């Protein structure tokens, strides 16, 4: 469903503007769709990229950002932080956002799994480390699950990902993400299963994540 919505966006517009598909949905889709996610987030890491979005949209639609029409569930709303709306597709309502990440070094690439430009894995680590600082202790622990899945499938976050997260959130960004992960892993088994079920995560996948190293940041050296 998400892929069919993404196909309606103009990839050339997004590439020219330097806009990338990111967030938890982008991560989950690459990691075998390990959890359910019905949000579509595009990140705009420069003033110019967000300006391109603001110039293209109005309260009725997304203009030239789309190459095929979408059915909107609510009007398009814009402020200095983002452009937000929701679309109806396949009987579902999907939240859609273009978020201003001005002055963030987030690498945007083409990826064979996606019909639009996406954040690379390093940029995904950066944004998830900071997201875990903002809301990591909040059930159903989406950011914790994503960090654990990324560690299990992608390995340690690159040094540049940690450096960029620290540039915006300070040197406590990794310790605070570690605390969120440790908090989740210390929950009673029933609470962890409940959180996983709320996100459509299979029990065997949860068991694999529980075996992942607790640290959100790079593993300690020898």
Model-derived features: positions:
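Compositionally biased terminal segments of proteins
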Residues: 1-222
